[in-house]
Protein backbone atom coordinates (compact mmCIF):
# COMPACT_ATOMS: atom_id res chain seq x y z
CA UNK A 1 0.00 0.00 0.00
CA UNK A 2 1.38 3.42 -0.95
CA UNK A 3 1.91 6.28 1.45
CA UNK A 4 -0.96 8.10 -0.21
CA UNK A 5 -3.33 5.24 0.52
CA UNK A 6 -2.12 5.02 4.11
CA UNK A 7 -3.30 8.58 4.83
CA UNK A 8 -6.00 8.32 7.49
CA UNK A 9 -8.85 10.79 7.07
CA UNK A 10 -10.26 12.86 9.94
CA UNK A 11 -13.48 13.97 8.28
CA UNK A 12 -15.94 13.04 5.54
CA UNK A 13 -17.48 15.21 2.84
CA UNK A 14 -21.24 14.88 2.45
CA UNK A 15 -22.43 15.45 -1.11
CA UNK A 16 -25.90 16.23 0.20
CA UNK A 17 -29.00 16.36 -1.97
CA UNK A 18 -29.02 16.48 -5.79
CA UNK A 19 -30.44 20.02 -5.88
CA UNK A 20 -29.53 22.57 -8.58
CA UNK A 21 -27.67 25.59 -7.10
CA UNK A 22 -30.41 28.01 -8.17
CA UNK A 23 -32.96 26.07 -6.08
CA UNK A 24 -30.73 25.62 -3.03
CA UNK A 25 -32.25 28.44 -0.95
CA UNK A 26 -35.80 27.38 -1.78
CA UNK A 27 -35.18 23.83 -0.58
CA UNK A 28 -33.31 25.13 2.46
CA UNK A 29 -36.40 27.12 3.49
CA UNK A 30 -38.64 24.12 2.79
CA UNK A 31 -36.56 21.71 4.88
CA UNK A 32 -36.24 24.26 7.68
CA UNK A 33 -40.04 24.65 7.85
CA UNK A 34 -40.50 20.87 7.77
CA UNK A 35 -37.97 20.35 10.57
CA UNK A 36 -39.51 23.06 12.76
CA UNK A 37 -42.95 21.54 12.13
CA UNK A 38 -41.60 18.14 13.21
CA UNK A 39 -40.12 19.54 16.42
CA UNK A 40 -43.19 21.61 17.30
CA UNK A 41 -45.73 18.88 16.47
CA UNK A 42 -43.99 16.17 18.48
CA UNK A 43 -43.26 18.51 21.39
CA UNK A 44 -46.94 19.47 21.61
CA UNK A 45 -47.98 15.81 21.83
CA UNK A 46 -45.34 15.06 24.49
CA UNK A 47 -46.33 18.11 26.58
CA UNK A 48 -50.06 17.34 26.29
CA UNK A 49 -49.54 13.75 27.44
CA UNK A 50 -47.45 14.92 30.41
CA UNK A 51 -49.86 17.69 31.48
CA UNK A 52 -53.23 15.99 30.94
CA UNK A 53 -54.03 13.18 33.37
CA UNK A 54 -56.69 11.82 30.99
CA UNK A 55 -53.84 10.76 28.68
CA UNK A 56 -51.93 8.80 31.33
CA UNK A 57 -52.82 5.48 29.69
CA UNK A 58 -50.72 2.74 28.05
CA UNK A 59 -51.45 3.93 24.50
CA UNK A 60 -50.30 7.47 25.23
CA UNK A 61 -47.26 6.29 27.16
CA UNK A 62 -46.15 4.56 23.96
CA UNK A 63 -47.19 7.56 21.85
CA UNK A 64 -45.17 10.01 23.96
CA UNK A 65 -42.09 7.83 23.56
CA UNK A 66 -42.75 7.53 19.81
CA UNK A 67 -43.05 11.32 19.52
CA UNK A 68 -39.78 11.74 21.39
CA UNK A 69 -38.18 9.14 19.11
CA UNK A 70 -39.46 10.91 15.96
CA UNK A 71 -38.25 14.29 17.21
CA UNK A 72 -34.76 12.97 17.95
CA UNK A 73 -34.62 10.81 14.80
CA UNK A 74 -35.22 13.85 12.61
CA UNK A 75 -32.76 15.90 14.70
CA UNK A 76 -29.97 13.39 14.01
CA UNK A 77 -29.78 14.36 10.33
CA UNK A 78 -31.74 17.56 9.66
CA UNK A 79 -29.62 20.17 11.51
CA UNK A 80 -26.46 18.90 9.80
CA UNK A 81 -28.24 18.86 6.43
CA UNK A 82 -29.40 22.46 6.91
CA UNK A 83 -25.93 23.53 8.04
CA UNK A 84 -24.23 21.89 5.05
CA UNK A 85 -26.70 23.44 2.61
CA UNK A 86 -25.36 26.83 3.71
CA UNK A 87 -21.71 25.74 3.81
CA UNK A 88 -19.07 25.81 1.08
CA UNK A 89 -17.45 22.67 2.54
CA UNK A 90 -20.22 20.23 3.63
CA UNK A 91 -18.12 18.12 5.96
CA UNK A 92 -18.61 16.06 9.12
CA UNK A 93 -15.83 14.93 11.52
CA UNK A 94 -15.04 11.23 11.80
CA UNK A 95 -16.27 11.11 15.42
CA UNK A 96 -19.38 13.05 14.45
CA UNK A 97 -20.06 10.54 11.69
CA UNK A 98 -19.90 7.62 14.13
CA UNK A 99 -22.16 9.48 16.56
CA UNK A 100 -24.65 10.13 13.76
CA UNK A 101 -24.67 6.43 12.87
CA UNK A 102 -25.31 5.46 16.50
CA UNK A 103 -28.21 7.85 17.10
CA UNK A 104 -29.68 7.25 13.64
CA UNK A 105 -29.90 3.51 14.35
CA UNK A 106 -30.96 4.04 17.96
CA UNK A 107 -33.95 6.31 17.35
CA UNK A 108 -34.92 4.55 14.11
CA UNK A 109 -35.09 1.18 15.88
CA UNK A 110 -36.77 2.69 18.94
CA UNK A 111 -39.68 3.92 16.83
CA UNK A 112 -39.89 0.49 15.22
CA UNK A 113 -40.20 -1.36 18.55
CA UNK A 114 -42.64 1.19 19.94
CA UNK A 115 -44.91 0.53 16.96
CA UNK A 116 -44.90 -3.15 18.00
CA UNK A 117 -45.88 -2.25 21.57
CA UNK A 118 -48.66 -0.01 20.28
CA UNK A 119 -49.94 -2.80 18.00
CA UNK A 120 -50.10 -5.17 20.99
CA UNK A 121 -51.93 -2.49 22.99
CA UNK A 122 -54.54 -2.13 20.21
CA UNK A 123 -54.87 -5.92 19.99
CA UNK A 124 -55.62 -6.23 23.71
CA UNK A 125 -58.02 -3.24 23.63
CA UNK A 126 -60.14 -4.77 20.85
CA UNK A 127 -59.86 -8.51 21.51
CA UNK A 128 -59.88 -8.42 25.33
CA UNK A 129 -61.62 -5.16 26.31
CA UNK A 130 -62.84 -6.46 29.68
CA UNK A 131 -59.33 -7.51 30.70
CA UNK A 132 -57.51 -4.55 29.18
CA UNK A 133 -56.52 -2.83 32.43
CA UNK A 134 -55.38 -6.13 33.91
CA UNK A 135 -53.26 -7.18 30.93
CA UNK A 136 -51.86 -3.74 30.09
CA UNK A 137 -50.70 -3.05 33.62
CA UNK A 138 -48.34 -0.14 34.34
CA UNK A 139 -45.58 -2.64 35.03
CA UNK A 140 -45.97 -4.33 31.63
CA UNK A 141 -46.14 -1.00 29.79
CA UNK A 142 -42.99 0.32 31.43
CA UNK A 143 -41.28 -3.02 30.79
CA UNK A 144 -42.12 -2.84 27.07
CA UNK A 145 -40.74 0.70 26.83
CA UNK A 146 -37.57 -0.18 28.75
CA UNK A 147 -37.07 -3.32 26.64
CA UNK A 148 -37.36 -1.20 23.49
CA UNK A 149 -34.68 1.19 24.75
CA UNK A 150 -32.35 -1.66 25.78
CA UNK A 151 -32.65 -3.55 22.48
CA UNK A 152 -32.07 -0.43 20.40
CA UNK A 153 -29.07 0.54 22.52
CA UNK A 154 -27.51 -2.86 21.88
CA UNK A 155 -28.22 -2.74 18.15
CA UNK A 156 -26.90 0.79 17.65
CA UNK A 157 -23.80 0.16 19.76
CA UNK A 158 -23.01 -3.08 17.90
CA UNK A 159 -22.98 -1.44 14.47
CA UNK A 160 -21.16 1.66 15.69
CA UNK A 161 -18.34 -0.37 17.26
CA UNK A 162 -18.03 -2.52 14.14
CA UNK A 163 -17.86 0.61 12.01
CA UNK A 164 -15.22 2.14 14.31
CA UNK A 165 -12.85 -0.77 13.66
CA UNK A 166 -12.74 -0.05 9.92
CA UNK A 167 -10.01 2.00 8.28
CA UNK A 168 -10.85 4.83 5.89
CA UNK A 169 -8.06 6.02 3.65
CA UNK A 170 -8.04 8.19 0.56
CA UNK A 171 -11.67 8.50 -0.53
CA UNK A 172 -13.78 10.44 1.98
CA UNK A 173 -16.73 11.59 -0.15
CA UNK A 174 -20.13 10.22 0.95
CA UNK A 175 -22.82 10.48 -1.77
CA UNK A 176 -25.51 11.21 0.80
CA UNK A 177 -26.71 13.95 3.17
CA UNK A 178 -25.79 11.94 6.29
CA UNK A 179 -23.40 9.17 7.31
CA UNK A 180 -25.20 6.22 5.77
CA UNK A 181 -23.66 2.87 6.77
CA UNK A 182 -23.86 1.30 3.32
CA UNK A 183 -22.14 4.33 1.78
CA UNK A 184 -19.40 4.24 4.43
CA UNK A 185 -18.72 0.54 3.88
CA UNK A 186 -17.96 1.28 0.23
CA UNK A 187 -15.32 3.83 1.31
CA UNK A 188 -13.54 1.52 3.78
CA UNK A 189 -10.09 0.26 2.81
CA UNK A 190 -10.21 -2.65 5.28
CA UNK A 191 -12.20 -5.89 5.26
CA UNK A 192 -15.94 -5.21 5.66
CA UNK A 193 -17.24 -8.78 5.48
CA UNK A 194 -17.99 -9.00 9.21
CA UNK A 195 -19.94 -5.73 9.05
CA UNK A 196 -21.94 -6.90 6.05
CA UNK A 197 -22.85 -10.25 7.64
CA UNK A 198 -23.87 -8.63 10.93
CA UNK A 199 -25.92 -5.98 9.12
CA UNK A 200 -27.77 -8.67 7.14
CA UNK A 201 -28.48 -10.91 10.15
CA UNK A 202 -29.38 -8.21 12.68
CA UNK A 203 -31.36 -6.11 10.20
CA UNK A 204 -33.40 -9.19 9.32
CA UNK A 205 -34.26 -9.67 12.98
CA UNK A 206 -34.85 -6.01 13.85
CA UNK A 207 -37.01 -5.33 10.78
CA UNK A 208 -38.73 -8.61 9.92
CA UNK A 209 -39.60 -9.68 13.49
CA UNK A 210 -41.32 -6.40 14.50
CA UNK A 211 -43.20 -6.31 11.19
CA UNK A 212 -44.31 -9.93 11.71
CA UNK A 213 -45.53 -9.17 15.26
CA UNK A 214 -47.48 -6.12 14.05
CA UNK A 215 -49.01 -8.17 11.23
CA UNK A 216 -50.01 -10.94 13.66
CA UNK A 217 -51.69 -8.38 15.93
CA UNK A 218 -53.78 -7.00 13.08
CA UNK A 219 -54.65 -10.46 11.75
CA UNK A 220 -56.07 -11.32 15.17
CA UNK A 221 -57.87 -7.97 15.36
CA UNK A 222 -59.52 -8.56 11.96
CA UNK A 223 -60.35 -12.14 12.96
CA UNK A 224 -61.98 -10.91 16.17
CA UNK A 225 -64.08 -8.35 14.26
CA UNK A 226 -65.24 -10.89 11.68
CA UNK A 227 -66.52 -13.21 14.42
CA UNK A 228 -69.03 -10.56 15.50
CA UNK A 229 -69.54 -8.41 12.39
CA UNK A 230 -71.32 -5.14 13.17
CA UNK A 231 -71.03 -1.58 11.96
CA UNK A 232 -70.32 -0.42 15.51
CA UNK A 233 -67.54 -2.97 15.96
CA UNK A 234 -65.93 -2.10 12.64
CA UNK A 235 -66.11 1.62 13.43
CA UNK A 236 -64.55 1.04 16.85
CA UNK A 237 -61.73 -0.99 15.32
CA UNK A 238 -60.93 1.60 12.67
CA UNK A 239 -61.15 4.50 15.12
CA UNK A 240 -58.87 2.63 17.52
CA UNK A 241 -56.33 1.35 14.99
CA UNK A 242 -56.59 3.76 12.07
CA UNK A 243 -53.88 6.17 13.20
CA UNK A 244 -51.45 3.42 14.19
CA UNK A 245 -52.05 1.52 10.95
CA UNK A 246 -51.36 4.69 8.94
CA UNK A 247 -48.05 5.27 10.73
CA UNK A 248 -47.03 1.62 10.32
CA UNK A 249 -47.85 1.73 6.60
CA UNK A 250 -45.88 4.94 6.15
CA UNK A 251 -42.84 3.62 8.05
CA UNK A 252 -42.62 0.14 6.56
CA UNK A 253 -43.71 1.28 3.11
CA UNK A 254 -40.73 3.62 2.99
CA UNK A 255 -38.31 1.00 4.33
CA UNK A 256 -39.52 -1.61 1.84
CA UNK A 257 -39.27 0.90 -0.99
CA UNK A 258 -35.71 1.75 0.03
CA UNK A 259 -34.22 -1.68 0.72
CA UNK A 260 -36.30 -4.15 -1.27
CA UNK A 261 -36.92 -2.33 -4.55
CA UNK A 262 -34.62 -3.29 -7.46
CA UNK A 263 -31.54 -1.11 -7.93
CA UNK A 264 -31.30 1.15 -10.95
CA UNK A 265 -28.78 3.44 -12.61
CA UNK A 266 -29.88 6.35 -10.42
CA UNK A 267 -30.00 4.25 -7.23
CA UNK A 268 -28.05 6.88 -5.27
CA UNK A 269 -30.67 9.53 -6.04
CA UNK A 270 -33.46 7.06 -5.23
CA UNK A 271 -31.84 6.13 -1.90
CA UNK A 272 -31.46 9.81 -1.00
CA UNK A 273 -35.09 10.62 -1.81
CA UNK A 274 -36.41 7.57 0.05
CA UNK A 275 -34.20 8.41 3.03
CA UNK A 276 -35.79 11.86 3.13
CA UNK A 277 -39.17 10.16 3.40
CA UNK A 278 -38.39 8.38 6.67
CA UNK A 279 -36.01 10.94 8.20
CA UNK A 280 -38.00 14.09 7.37
CA UNK A 281 -41.52 13.40 6.08
CA UNK A 282 -42.61 10.54 8.36
CA UNK A 283 -41.58 12.20 11.68
CA UNK A 284 -43.34 15.37 10.51
CA UNK A 285 -46.59 13.62 9.55
CA UNK A 286 -46.90 11.33 12.59
CA UNK A 287 -48.14 14.04 15.02
CA UNK A 288 -50.84 15.08 12.53
CA UNK A 289 -51.89 11.48 11.90
CA UNK A 290 -52.27 10.83 15.63
CA UNK A 291 -54.00 14.12 16.46
CA UNK A 292 -56.30 15.07 13.55
CA UNK A 293 -58.89 12.34 14.24
CA UNK A 294 -58.01 11.71 17.87
CA UNK A 295 -60.65 13.08 20.22
CA UNK A 296 -58.46 12.48 23.28
CA UNK A 297 -55.64 14.66 21.91
CA UNK A 298 -58.08 17.37 20.81
CA UNK A 299 -59.77 17.27 24.21
CA UNK A 300 -56.43 17.49 26.01
CA UNK A 301 -55.43 20.46 23.86
CA UNK A 302 -58.65 22.28 24.75
CA UNK A 303 -58.34 21.48 28.46
CA UNK A 304 -54.71 22.61 28.67
CA UNK A 305 -55.36 25.87 26.81
CA UNK A 306 -58.56 26.59 28.76
CA UNK A 307 -56.73 25.95 32.03
CA UNK A 308 -53.90 28.30 31.04
CA UNK A 309 -56.43 30.93 29.91
CA UNK A 310 -58.27 30.79 33.24
CA UNK A 311 -54.98 31.08 35.14
CA UNK A 312 -54.00 34.13 33.08
CA UNK A 313 -57.39 35.80 33.68
CA UNK A 314 -57.02 35.24 37.42
Curated annotation (Swiss-Prot):
Membrane protein topology class: Multi-pass membrane protein
Stored InterPro entries: GPCR_Rhodpsn, GPCR_Rhodpsn_7TM, Olfact_rcpt
GO CC terms in record: membrane; plasma membrane
PROSITE patterns reported for this sequence: G_PROTEIN_RECEP_F1_1 (PS00237), G_PROTEIN_RECEP_F1_2 (PS50262)
Pfam families registered for this protein in UniProt: 7tm_4 (PF13853)
Tissue-specificity statement: Olfactory epithelium.
Segments passing through the bilayer: 30-50, 58-78, 98-118, 144-164, 197-217, 240-260, 272-292
GO biological process: G protein-coupled receptor signaling pathway; sensory perception of smell
Subcellular location(s) per record: Cell membrane
Subcellular location, principal: membrane
Topology, Cytoplasmic side: 51-57, 119-143, 218-239, 293-314
Disulfide bonds: 97-179
UniProtKB keywords: Cell membrane, Disulfide bond, G-protein coupled receptor, Glycoprotein, Membrane, Olfaction, Receptor, Sensory transduction, Transducer, Transmembrane, Transmembrane helix
Extracellular-facing ranges: 1-29, 79-97, 165-196, 261-271
Glycosylation site positions: 5, 265-266
Gene Ontology MF terms: G protein-coupled receptor activity; olfactory receptor activity
Keyword Transmembrane appears in the UniProt entry: yes
Family to which this protein belongs: Belongs to the G-protein coupled receptor 1 family.
Task performed by this protein: Odorant receptor. Activated by a lily-derived aldehyde as well as other odorants. May signal through an inositol 1,4,5-trisphosphate (IP3) second messenger system.
The protein's name: Olfactory receptor 1E16
Species this chain originates from: Mus musculus (Mouse)
Gene: Or1e16
Amino acid sequence: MTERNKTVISQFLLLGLPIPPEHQQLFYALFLVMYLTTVLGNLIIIILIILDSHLHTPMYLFLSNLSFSDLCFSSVTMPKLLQNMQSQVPSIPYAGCLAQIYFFLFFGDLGNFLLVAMAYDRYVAICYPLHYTTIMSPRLCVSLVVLSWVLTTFHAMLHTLLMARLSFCEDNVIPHYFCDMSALLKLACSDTRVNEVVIFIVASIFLVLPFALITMSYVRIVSSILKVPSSQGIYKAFSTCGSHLSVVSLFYGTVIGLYLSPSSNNSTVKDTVMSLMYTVVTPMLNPFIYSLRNRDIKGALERVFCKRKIQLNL
